[in-house]
């Protein structure tokens, strides 16, 4: 890495002795500058419509702050950005915003770009401005911020945001170089600017000097501009804060790396920037725009454009408002349209054919060339490379263009990068000297675009990967934090309950569950260890019996006072006998079911209990049968009143028989308590419920 102090030493040596160095390669094409630099810069009439592109610099477009239908003034801000790479654009005149839509761009592709279309009102009315006389009343930060807000970018061709360059160079600048070389043929806009606006240009340079605080300031101008050199030297008489250095005419001496090499003899390493060597470089047009912004309070809304070529009769340099259609400029300088010959934007070495003359003037537009048949010939057909090495000899960056050509054709991106394609400054020298008419610059630009696309895809993939990993880490962290919070809350609750009750509730609950399971296992296990399902069987039978009882229909029950017919009374008596008998049988069956379940405890007692149950059930059945006989005898009475009385007596006796059957179930349950109190209680309860329900049903039927 080159020491900035060495650069400063070489510049001071140049200042004292005038010593200059050179760089490898380069060419000396015909200049063709005299046809346009003989007249002062002039202004033209304004067009009816302006087409202001939202992107006119090396960076990104800002956010629109106007809408269709808004009335805007000259110099009013149309977009705003969030950082220095988002330069705002401003209205070139006063008028109405009639559209915001894609419009053909001043680019080789001609692809549409978002454009603000303004219809002029003819007043050309400025916004409110606040000019100042002395820039020393502002701080460096205030100047940088104003340079940004007023949309100033490098006007030498790269259009890099000036505020960004100034902020990056803070406290590192040793040498400030003002580039007035203007080495490309035909272009004379900087030449005329230095001649016609010398004082304002020097004021802009002093503003840069105030912000950057360099130790030396040098203005470099090619020696084919004697009038510009003389004008600046005359203005600098008696001043010692900067000096002018004339350099030999050679293309591309105006490129930043080559100009540094001429002035210092030091070559900037590949991949490094001039600021890393303590050097900051600005174009003369940029310095002039800074003066207009800081002193006059005017944003960048116009620039000097060279109009030249044999198809233009009134050649020269003009003030062109940004957004002016190029065809409007050409019509005012007597352009003779000819479809056989294209119009170029830029110089003959780095420029391109305009896809449409409706394209607007932007901050990059420094020259418009309209050639005739003496200046322009259709491109020769491309031939095979003969490996003559002319391109390598002429390359000012010491690259191997013929090798890069093969790599570009094969789309071997890795090899292209290994051979430093990124160091190519696209000056066009290699294509100029190629005897095979190979458009090398086109190949190199396409290869750079492809490499950039691959890198952007890789960058996006890496960013997506990082976002995914960050998301996973965040989710895992949130999960761990949530688990920790839940655990802490549970521990806190247990501690609080333990303090209030003296025991851990969770542990106590677990102990209760364990004790309950042990008790259940003890109850449901026989003496021999086999499982005891008798209780479940009893409950199942009881549920079945209850279901059968529920299915008995209780309809067609005649009121007691309606049984006046002897025949009906006889039928009722028969039904009563049947129901009583069925009740006795169910009671006998219940006793029989309960008896086997209790045999495990004491077989003898179970047998006695079963015998008693059967005896009592027979007695209840006999009583029910006797009751039915009495009812039948009584039904023989022909008197309806007596028949009704007999039926009522039959119902009462049937009800009494059902109650006795219920008592039998109770006694059986009581006797079985010796074997198993729990099972006996369950069986007795079920028996009572069933007997009572059956008695009620019989009473209703009678």
Curated annotation (Swiss-Prot):
<feature type="binding site">
    <location>
        <position position="391"/>
    </location>
    <ligand>
        <name>[4Fe-4S] cluster 1</name>
    </ligand>
</feature>
<dbReference type="Pfam" id="PF01512">
    <property type="entry name" value="Complex1_51K"/>
</dbReference>
<dbReference type="GO" id="GO:0051539">
    <property type="term" value="F:4 iron, 4 sulfur cluster binding"/>
</dbReference>
<feature type="domain" description="4Fe-4S ferredoxin-type 1">
    <location>
        <begin position="375"/>
        <end position="405"/>
    </location>
</feature>
<feature type="binding site">
    <location>
        <position position="395"/>
    </location>
    <ligand>
        <name>[4Fe-4S] cluster 2</name>
    </ligand>
</feature>
<dbReference type="InterPro" id="IPR010208">
    <property type="entry name" value="Ion_transpt_RnfC/RsxC"/>
</dbReference>
<keyword id="KW-0472">Membrane</keyword>
<dbReference type="InterPro" id="IPR017896">
    <property type="entry name" value="4Fe4S_Fe-S-bd"/>
</dbReference>
<dbReference type="GO" id="GO:0009055">
    <property type="term" value="F:electron transfer activity"/>
</dbReference>
<feature type="binding site">
    <location>
        <position position="430"/>
    </location>
    <ligand>
        <name>[4Fe-4S] cluster 2</name>
    </ligand>
</feature>
<comment type="similarity">
    <text>Belongs to the 4Fe4S bacterial-type ferredoxin family. RnfC subfamily.</text>
</comment>
<keyword id="KW-1278">Translocase</keyword>
<feature type="binding site">
    <location>
        <position position="385"/>
    </location>
    <ligand>
        <name>[4Fe-4S] cluster 1</name>
    </ligand>
</feature>
<protein>
    <recommendedName>
        <fullName>Ion-translocating oxidoreductase complex subunit C</fullName>
        <ecNumber>7.-.-.-</ecNumber>
    </recommendedName>
</protein>
<feature type="region of interest" description="Disordered">
    <location>
        <begin position="482"/>
        <end position="503"/>
    </location>
</feature>
<keyword id="KW-0997">Cell inner membrane</keyword>
<keyword id="KW-0479">Metal-binding</keyword>
<keyword id="KW-0411">Iron-sulfur</keyword>
<dbReference type="GO" id="GO:0022900">
    <property type="term" value="P:electron transport chain"/>
</dbReference>
<dbReference type="GO" id="GO:0005886">
    <property type="term" value="C:plasma membrane"/>
</dbReference>
<keyword id="KW-0249">Electron transport</keyword>
<dbReference type="InterPro" id="IPR011538">
    <property type="entry name" value="Nuo51_FMN-bd"/>
</dbReference>
<feature type="binding site">
    <location>
        <position position="388"/>
    </location>
    <ligand>
        <name>[4Fe-4S] cluster 1</name>
    </ligand>
</feature>
<feature type="domain" description="4Fe-4S ferredoxin-type 2">
    <location>
        <begin position="415"/>
        <end position="444"/>
    </location>
</feature>
<feature type="binding site">
    <location>
        <position position="434"/>
    </location>
    <ligand>
        <name>[4Fe-4S] cluster 1</name>
    </ligand>
</feature>
<keyword id="KW-1003">Cell membrane</keyword>
<keyword id="KW-0677">Repeat</keyword>
<dbReference type="GO" id="GO:0046872">
    <property type="term" value="F:metal ion binding"/>
</dbReference>
<comment type="subunit">
    <text>The complex is composed of six subunits: RnfA, RnfB, RnfC, RnfD, RnfE and RnfG.</text>
</comment>
<dbReference type="Pfam" id="PF13375">
    <property type="entry name" value="RnfC_N"/>
</dbReference>
<comment type="function">
    <text>Part of a membrane-bound complex that couples electron transfer with translocation of ions across the membrane.</text>
</comment>
<keyword id="KW-0004">4Fe-4S</keyword>
<feature type="binding site">
    <location>
        <position position="427"/>
    </location>
    <ligand>
        <name>[4Fe-4S] cluster 2</name>
    </ligand>
</feature>
<dbReference type="Pfam" id="PF12838">
    <property type="entry name" value="Fer4_7"/>
</dbReference>
<dbReference type="InterPro" id="IPR017900">
    <property type="entry name" value="4Fe4S_Fe_S_CS"/>
</dbReference>
<dbReference type="InterPro" id="IPR037225">
    <property type="entry name" value="Nuo51_FMN-bd_sf"/>
</dbReference>
<keyword id="KW-0408">Iron</keyword>
<keyword id="KW-0813">Transport</keyword>
<dbReference type="InterPro" id="IPR026902">
    <property type="entry name" value="RnfC_N"/>
</dbReference>
<feature type="binding site">
    <location>
        <position position="424"/>
    </location>
    <ligand>
        <name>[4Fe-4S] cluster 2</name>
    </ligand>
</feature>
């Amino acid at each position: 890495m080159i020491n900035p102090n060495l650069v400063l030493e070489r510049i001071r040596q140049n200042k004292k002795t005038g010593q200059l160095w050179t760089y490898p390669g380069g060419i000396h094409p015909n200049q063709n500058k005299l046809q346009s630099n003989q007249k002062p810069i002039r202004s033209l009439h304004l067009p009816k419509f302006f087409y202001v592109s939202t992107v006119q610099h090396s960076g990104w477009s800002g956010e629109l702050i106007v809408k269709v239908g808004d009335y805007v003034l000259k110099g009013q801000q149309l977009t705003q950005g969030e950082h220095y790479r988002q330069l705002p654009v401003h209205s070139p005149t006063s008028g109405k915003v009639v559209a915001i839509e894609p419009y053909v761009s001043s680019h080789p592709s001609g692809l549409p770009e978002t454009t603000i279309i303004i219809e002029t009102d003819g007043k050309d009315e400025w916004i409110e401005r606040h000019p100042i006389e002395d820039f020393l009343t502002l701080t460096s930060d205030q100047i940088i911020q104003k340079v940004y807000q007023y949309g100033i970018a490098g006007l030498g061709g790269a259009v890099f945001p000036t505020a960004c360059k100034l902020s990056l160079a803070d406290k590192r600048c040793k040498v400030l170089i003002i580039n007035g070389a203007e080495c490309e043929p035909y272009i004379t806009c900087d030449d005329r600017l230095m001649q016609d606006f010398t004082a304002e240009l020097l004021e802009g340079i002093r503003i840069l000097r105030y912000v950057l605080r360099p130790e030396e300031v040098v203005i470099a101008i090619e020696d084919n501009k004697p009038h510009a050199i003389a004008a600046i030297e005359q203005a600098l008489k008696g001043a010692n804060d900067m000096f002018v250095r004339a350099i030999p005419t050679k293309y591309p001496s105006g490129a930043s790396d080559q100009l540094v090499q001429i002035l210092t003899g030091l070559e900037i390493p590949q991949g490094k920037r001039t600021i890393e060597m303590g050097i900051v470089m600005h174009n003369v047009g940029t310095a002039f725009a800074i003066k207009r912004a800081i002193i006059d309070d005017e944003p960048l809304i116009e620039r000097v454009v060279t109009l030249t070529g044999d198809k233009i009769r009134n050649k020269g340099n003009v003030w062109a408002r940004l957004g002016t259609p190029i065809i409007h400029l050409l019509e005012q300088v007597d352009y003779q349209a000819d479809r056989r010959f294209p119009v170029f934007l830029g110089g003959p070495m780095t420029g391109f054919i305009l896809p449409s003359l409706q394209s607007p003037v932007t901050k990059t537009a420094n020259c418009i060339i309209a050639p005739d048949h003496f200046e322009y010939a259709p491109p020769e057909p491309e031939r095979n490379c003969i490996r003559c090495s002319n391109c390598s000899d002429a390359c000012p960056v010491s690259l191997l263009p013929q090798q890069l050509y093969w790599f570009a054709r094969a789309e071997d991106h890795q090899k292209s990068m290994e051979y430093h394609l990124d160091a190519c400054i696209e000056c066009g020298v290699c294509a100029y000297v190629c005897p095979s008419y190979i458009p090398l610059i086109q190949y190199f630009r396409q290869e750079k675009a492809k490499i950039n696309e691959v890198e952007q895809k890789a960058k996006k993939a890496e960013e997506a990967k990082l976002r995914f990993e960050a998301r996973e880490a965040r989710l895992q962290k949130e999960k761990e934090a949530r688990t920790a919070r839940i655990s802490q809350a549970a521990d806190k609750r247990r501690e609080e309950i333990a303090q209030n009750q003296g025991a851990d509730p969770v542990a106590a609950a677990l102990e209760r569950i364990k004790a309950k399971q042990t008790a259940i296992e003890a109850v449901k296990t026989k003496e021999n260890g086999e499982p005891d399902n008798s209780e479940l069987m009893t409950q199942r039978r009881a549920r079945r019996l209850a279901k059968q009882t529920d299915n008995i229909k209780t309809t067609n029950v005649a009121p007691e006072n309606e049984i006046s017919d002897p025949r009906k009374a006889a039928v009722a008596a028969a039904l009563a006998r049947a129901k009583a008998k069925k009740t006795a049988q169910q009671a006998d069956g219940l006793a029989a079911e309960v008896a086997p379940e209790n045999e495990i405890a004491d077989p003898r007692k179970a047998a006695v209990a079963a015998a008693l149950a059967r005896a009592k059930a027979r007695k209840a059945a006999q009583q029910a049968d006797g009751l039915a006989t009495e009812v039948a005898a009584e039904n023989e009475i022909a008197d309806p009143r007596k028949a009704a009385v007999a039926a009522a007596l039959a119902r009462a006796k049937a009800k009494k028989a059902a109650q006795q059957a219920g008592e039998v179930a109770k006694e059986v349950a009581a006797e079985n308590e010796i074997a198993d109190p729990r099972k006996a209680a369950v069986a007795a309860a079920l028996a009572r419920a069933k007997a009572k329900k059956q008695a009620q049903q019989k009473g209703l039927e009678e």
